[in-house]
Amino acid sequence: MSPTAGLGPAAALFHGFSDPTRLAILRHLATGEHKVRELTEHLGLAQSTVSAHLACLAGCGLVASRPVGRASLYALAAEPELHQVLAAAERLLTVTGHAVELCPHSGTPGPDGPAAA
């Protein structure tokens, strides 16, 4: 059996985190649901760029959408778990000397107590 066998889903998940724009989208979606238009205004990017990143994030299982009229609202998928992953990444980045706020809720106590910023 190949050493990489079965790692495809994990690689797809981490691919979702591998781009600064996708991280910015995730960070903004952590504040609640948003339409593509709202994300483009917040990020200052073209609609096609944001839509492409949302498609990637949806393919990775990190975001979900629901139709509202002619638009779609995007939100984090598996929200509590995704907040935990982002908070853990913040702690790891802090330990390595590269503190970054990835999740607006990182100061919110999780199952293991308060998250470190």
Predicted regions and their residues:
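N-terminal helix-turn-helix DNA-binding core of bacterial DNA-binding proteins
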Residues: 8-49, 70-81
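Beta-hairpin "wing" of winged helix-turn-helix
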Residues: 58-69, 75
